[in-house]
Amino acid sequence: MPPAAMGLNPSMRIGLLHPGAMGASVGACLTACGHPVSWVNHNRSPATQARAVRAGLRPCADLAQLTQDAELIISVCPPHAATEVARGIAATGYQGQYLEANAIAPTKLAAIDALLSEHHIHLIDGSLIGGPVWPSESAGSQTTLHLSGPDSNTIAALLVGSPLKTAVLSDQPGDASALKMVFAAFSKGSAALTAEILNVAEQYGVRAPLSQALGQQTIAQWHRALASTASKAWRFEGEMQEIAETFSAVGAEPGFHQAAAAVYQKLSAHK
């Protein structure tokens, strides 16, 4: 589909931090909808540079240049870096909209919202559920950007016609982050438990009978899931810590996902 045909709304000038595997695909969907998307290319890896080129992103030298003409900043980064990215944007004097689309606890989202509000920056809470989706490879994709907070409908309108689906949850910042946390608590928390079950079975020498008891199809599914997880374990460690904080904040037990964080830390050492 030609870029002009995908977007049904006037274009918006967007700054993206950063074009990792997920961020680059978000940028690609936005550029396919006719929105100019810029990024900071200073000191970025060749792999990141290549993703940005593929997504059609416009390079900027620094944050000051990125924010100078932007109407919207989108933050897609590892959870541990979310606050630092927000501080960097606030320091530039930018006063537009800010889509916080990271896997972070609602408590951290609230702290970032307070920080940005002091600088007259308007936060929209976002959470991405699903894998990277590119306009050229979108058949059957269910990847969704969930949104909450004021101006959520404005953000959703940017992606009309895009393979990246959107869902506006409410006008309350924190709801999108909470959804991401409980979803990942199950999906990625279960993967960590699976990894440790297989590890313990191996240590006790009962891996083969476990395979028989569970069935080869189940074990094969586990192995496929773990193979795709290993390279992202360093990110998932931080995500599990955010989930533990999310649980703790409402009096639920954080220990499950603190342990999952430790499992992903071990996996990241063997990627």
Question: Language-model features: where?
Answer:
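NAD(P)+-binding Rossmann beta1-loop-alpha1 motif at the extreme N-terminus of oxidoreductases
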Residues: P2-Q68
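Helical "substrate-binding/catalytic lid" subdomain
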Residues: A178-K271
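Hydrophobic beta-strand scaffold residues
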Residues: V37, P59, H122-I124, T166, ...
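Rossmann-fold dinucleotide-binding core
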Residues: I104-A185
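Glycine- and other small-residue-rich loops at beta-strand/loop junctions that grip anionic moieties
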Residues: P19, S75, A101-N102, S148, ...
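Rossmann-fold NAD(P) dinucleotide-binding segment
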Residues: L63-H122
